[in-house]
């Protein structure tokens, strides 16, 4: 998924059988995703299955992982490699951010069984709301 042009100078994908989702023309996506942008992104993702490896631009867009997990219709566990747990409450209901997407998946996806966060500081994990401690 290309939101910023990050892949233009990259070679790892060239000559391979890959599908690219062009998203540079979608406003309202950098670090935060508004409702209109989410609608357009979901439409562009619609033809693709959740299975596989998905390159999601830079860390400014890793909230897109929620849209991929929304497509999973069987029980699953989510492993997140990040320095932050990304489980903060959203400041605005109609915006998703890099800081709240894991919480939104936990709150809305009935197939999600467990989340494992690798790399976040222990103090950030301990600061999570107690309802999320076992998940």
Tell me what each language-model feature is.
Residues 1-135:
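Conserved alpha-helical scaffold segments that buttress catalytic/binding sites
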